[in-house]
Amino acid sequence: IDLVAQRGIADKFHFPGFMRGRQVQEVLADSDVYIMPSVSEPFGISPLEAMQVGCPSIISHQSGCAEILSHAIKTDYWDIDAMADAIYAIVKYPAMYKSLRELGRDEVNNIKWYDAGLKVRRIYNMVLGWG
């Protein structure tokens, strides 16, 4: 927050503090881009929440959800130039924004916990030699 103030760009950011449920969805839906430059995130559900309401997402390759999301931009968490380029591209190119928005929403809406459970079960069965 201090850095944003020092650079005189406070009008470009919103730091809402802790939010709940519907508040989170409303803020994400009003956002141009969601960024999760996580060093290590076992899964990280917040990019899925952003994508579900049509907010293009930038995530780190190191986050667990990077393995399942095809329609999020992925960078290394330490590569701030790549993150800045991704933000710029999403904001500058309407077709890219629209594509990430629509395809991301569709992708997340088609993720089913039941399907994930079946995949895990198949892997267990394969490893245990049960079929």
Where are the model-predicted features located?
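Short hydrophobic beta-strand element within catalytic cores of glycosyltransferases
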Residues: 56-59
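A charged, aromatic-enriched C-terminal amphipathic alpha-helix characteristic of glycosyltransferases
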Residues: 95-126
